[in-house]
C-alpha cells in the first residue's frame, strides 16, 4: 500500500492550490488547522492495531504528565505510520499549509516520528512547545477525557502575557480555552510556541493513540539531549 492510499484525497486534494491557501489562512489566524477525515476511515483499524503493537516497546515518560512514547527508531520498516511520515507528498503538503515553506524531516533517530499512547489516568499538563509547529494524526480517542485543550495565541514574541497565562493554568479563564477535535483520522498542524495547551486526563480502558510527525524549515534538526532523556529514557544507539 502506498502512503497516498491512506489519505482521503477526494476530500483533501494534496495538490489543490485553493485548498493550500484556505488552510494557510486558517493557520495564520488561529495558529492551528484541523483536517478531519484526512486518513480514510477504512484504514484506521489497521493503524490502531499497529499502534497497539508498537506500544509494547514504548517508554513511560512522566515529565509534566504521564504518557507512553514510541521513538522513531522503534517503528519497523513495514510500518504504515513510518511510510506516511517518510513520504514527500505529505511533507510537501504540510509545507503548503504553512505557506509555501520548504520542509525537511527531522534528523533525529528518536524524535522524528513518535507515537504518543495514553492510558487511564494519563495526562499532559499545560505547556508551550519549543517549535513553531507540530503535525499530529489522531488514531484512537479514549472513552472519555483526553481532550486537546488550546488557549490559542495567548502569548507572542513581544509579550509573554504572564498574568493571562497564569490565569489559564489556574482554571480562571475558561473563556480562552477551546477543545480541538481529535476524531480518528484527523490531521492537525499546530503552533504550540504561542498557544498554551494540554491533554486532559484519560478516563477508561481504551488507549488514546496519536502519531506525532516532526518537520522543520531547515535540515539536520535534532531534539536536545535533555528532551531525549526525559521523553525516551535513552540516547540513540
Task: For the regions a language model picked out, list residue spans one by one.
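Short strand-connecting beta-turns/loops that link adjacent beta-strands
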Residues: 40, 131, 144, 204-205
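Catalytic core of non-heme Fe(II) oxygenases with the double-stranded beta-helix
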Residues: 95-100, 104-189
